[in-house]
């Protein structure tokens, strides 16, 4: 697993945003009610929907409550779990300073964990994977947009079974 600095993440995000521009509308948009609950099943379903990836990434782009290092989040149990996970994986920079999480093919459990954190903490995040230029967006507005790949029909069925709904 690697964490990319802000300037590297910005370059990678521009590349991904161009891919989004190629496909104006997502293939599927799902909604959910956020809150302090268990997102592990949804995160595992999203990760499994990628299939056999060579490289997968999640980029934090925004969160209403900040990046977990501000004063308001300092006492948050959920943000504390994320900071502890991040430190345990060798990253001590703030999330704003190193927002891009990259995973190799054997790190699907770690990818699933960071997707779970993104859902739980209400991030705007880009999830992408290779091969196949797979692309999914998570939104703090309780929305998941599937643009490309992710076995999107099957993933939608699983997420709907977990209480998510289409628009």
Name every feature range the model reports, one short phrase each.
Residues 1-167:
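Structured alpha/beta or helical-core interaction and ligand-binding surfaces enriched in interleaved
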């Amino acid at each position: 697993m690697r964490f990319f600095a802000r300037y590297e993440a910005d370059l990678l995000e521009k590349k991904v945003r161009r891919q989004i521009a190629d496909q104006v509308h997502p293939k599927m948009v799902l909604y959910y009610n956020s809150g302090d609950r268990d997102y592990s099943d949804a995160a595992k379903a999203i990760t499994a929907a990628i299939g056999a990836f060579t490289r997968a990434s999640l980029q934090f782009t925004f969160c209403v409550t900040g990046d977990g290092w501000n004063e308001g989040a300092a006492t948050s149990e959920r943000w504390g779990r994320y900071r502890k996970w991040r430190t345990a994986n060798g990253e001590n920079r703030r999330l704003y300073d190193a927002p891009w999480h990259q995973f190799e093919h054997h790190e699907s459990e770690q990818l699933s964990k960071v997707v779970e954190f993104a859902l739980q903490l209400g991030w705007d995040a880009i999830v992408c994977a290779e091969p196949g230029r797979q692309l999914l967006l998570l939104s703090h507005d309780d929305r998941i947009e599937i643009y490309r790949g992710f076995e999107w029909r099957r993933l939608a069925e699983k997420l709907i079974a977990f209480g998510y709904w289409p628009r």
